[in-house]
């Protein structure tokens, strides 16, 4: 019987029962070009309003995985599990740059397929492109070699991995259907499955700087990812973490790379960044069978940091992908620095009771460190550092942050935006946890 995309779309629109084989046929048509952009848009909008049942979400994820190459690590002679993490994104979220090396130093193999920033959120690929020579788009063969030799490779989605997802996402991006939980789930997990990942630790952000607008929707997304990931044969757990302020006390591409290097070498380990990094990395070790429990995992991760093994793995990955061999030892020699730096003075004394993390991310975009639209050229040197935290006591005139900009005018504009993002009150706010919940 001939498969008609419009009939499949009608079933999704009308919430009729879906045959998983039809889901696969639709995705095959997307890949082959037999399904038009208009039909993809109609499908995406139908899913946005109705969502998909679990069986169809799993089928969509597997079909998108199978639309291109699927990496099989069994022939690579790896002596450990293939594991990964993924974040829904936020501000100052540089966990990928530290978790990957930590887990690799503990015996895991991490082929991390990452993305670029859009809107207020920073992208891991953008951070890595601040490193001179670093190749974020190696061939599949190079990806295999780097993962085998360094234990990790943080790169972008290649044309061969989940191409159907790439086409569907391009349509979602211009049809106001990005926020569909079913489509987000399939997009994230199809790429992880295509990369041959056996276990995934998912970081779902909650708060003013989160991708999802409410805590309830963040929890719903986490549940969907866990159920679909496990249903598709990849051990998956999700952690809900706080994004009511920047995770690290900085935001901006080169600035965050420097922060990651400081974390790995022990020069500075901000408490919130450490809490989330250890929670996710410990999940990866326990799910991958590299640790007996969370306590054992944390002990191993701490040893990987203190011995320098994690920093060495990061350095090995950077060099293997074309970056400077001495980046960890001499980051100031290689990472770009902005021409102007200016402190952001607090307008009044008091306690920091609220931070609009999204506004901080948009301030970085305004400086040129993020994209207002796809295709924008980035200034990797700009951003924010020394960000004051929620609950901190400040005096009038005390710096809330330092702005790094290409010139004094843009620094002044960003400083105004940062100042408005902070609300200072007379009483200290209630303390909040950085790790809210774990969903398994």
Swiss-Prot record:
InterPro entries on file: Glycosyl_Trfase_fam3 (IPR000312), Glycosyl_Trfase_fam3_N_dom (IPR017459), Glycosyl_Trfase_fam3_N_dom_sf (IPR036320), Nuc_phospho_transferase (IPR035902), PYNP-like_C_sf (IPR036566), PYNP_C (IPR013102), Pyrmidine_PPas_bac/euk (IPR018090), Pyrmidine_PPase_CS (IPR017872)
Pathway the protein contributes to: Pyrimidine metabolism; dTMP biosynthesis via salvage pathway; dTMP from thymine: step 1/2
PROSITE patterns: THYMID_PHOSPHORYLASE (PS00647)
A GO MF term: thymidine phosphorylase activity
Signal sequence segment: none
One GO term (biological process): pyrimidine nucleobase metabolic process
An annotated GO cellular component: cytosol
Lineage top rank: taxon: Bacteria
Keyword Transferase: yes
Annotated catalysed reactions: thymidine + phosphate = 2-deoxy-alpha-D-ribose 1-phosphate + thymine
Uppermost EC category: transferase
UniProt keyword terms in alphabetical order: Glycosyltransferase, Transferase
Protein family (similarity comment): Belongs to the thymidine/pyrimidine-nucleoside phosphorylase family.
Function: The enzymes which catalyze the reversible phosphorolysis of pyrimidine nucleosides are involved in the degradation of these compounds and in their utilization as carbon and energy sources, or in the rescue of pyrimidine bases for nucleotide synthesis.
Complex and partners: Homodimer.
Protein name: Thymidine phosphorylase
């Amino acid at each position: 019987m001939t498969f008609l995309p419009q009939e499949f779309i009608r079933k999704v629109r009308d919430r009729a029962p879906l045959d998983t084989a039809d889901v696969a046929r639709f995705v095959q048509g997307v890949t082959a070009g037999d399904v038009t952009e208009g039909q993809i848009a109609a499908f995406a909008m139908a899913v946005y309003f109705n969502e998909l049942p679990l069986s169809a979400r799993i089928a969509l994820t597997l079909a998108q995985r199978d639309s291109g190459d699927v990496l099989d690590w069994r022939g690579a002679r790896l002596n450990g599990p293939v594991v990964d993490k993924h974040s829904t994104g936020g501000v100052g979220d540089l966990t990928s740059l530290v978790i990957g090396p930590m887990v690799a130093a503990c015996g895991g193999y991490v082929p991390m397929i990452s993305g670029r920033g859009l809107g207020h959120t920073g992208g891991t690929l953008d951070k890595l492109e601040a490193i001179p020579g670093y190749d974020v788009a190696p061939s599949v063969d190079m990806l295999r070699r780097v993962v085998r030799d360094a234990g990790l490779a943080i790169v972008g989605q290649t044309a061969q991995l989940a191409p159907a997802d790439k086409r569907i996402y391009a349509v979602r991006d211009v049809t106001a259907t990005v926020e569909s939980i079913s489509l987000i789930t399939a997009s994230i997990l199809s790429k992880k499955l295509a990369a041959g990942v056996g276990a995934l630790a998912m970081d779902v952000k909650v708060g003013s700087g989160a991708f999802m607008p409410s805590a309830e929707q963040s929890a719903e997304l986490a549940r969907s990812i866990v159920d679909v990931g496990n249903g598709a044969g990849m051990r998956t757990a999700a952690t809900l973490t706080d994004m009511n302020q920047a995770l690290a006390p900085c935001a901006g591409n080169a600035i965050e790379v420097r922060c990651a290097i400081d974390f790995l070498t022990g020069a500075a380990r901000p408490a919130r960044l450490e809490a989330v990094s250890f929670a996710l990395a410990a999940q990866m070790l326990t799910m991958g069978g590299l640790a007996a429990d969370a306590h054992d995992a944390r002990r191993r991760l701490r040893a990987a940091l203190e011995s320098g093994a994690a920093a060495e793995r990061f350095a090995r990955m950077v060099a293997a992908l074309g970056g400077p061999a001495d980046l960890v030892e001499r980051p100031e020699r290689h990472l770009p620095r902005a021409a102007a730096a200016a402190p952001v003075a607090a307008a009044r004394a008091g306690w920091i009771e609220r931070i609009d993390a999204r506004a901080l991310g948009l301030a970085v975009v305004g400086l040129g460190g993020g994209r207002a639209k796809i295709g924008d050229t980035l200034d990797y040197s700009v951003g924010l550092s020394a960000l004051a935290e929620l609950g901190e006591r400040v005096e009038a005139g005390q710096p809330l942050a330092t702005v790094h900009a290409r010139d004094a005018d843009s620094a002044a504009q960003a400083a105004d935006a940062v100042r408005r993002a902070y609300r200072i009150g007379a009483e200290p706010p209630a303390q909040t946890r950085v790790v809210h919940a774990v969903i398994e």
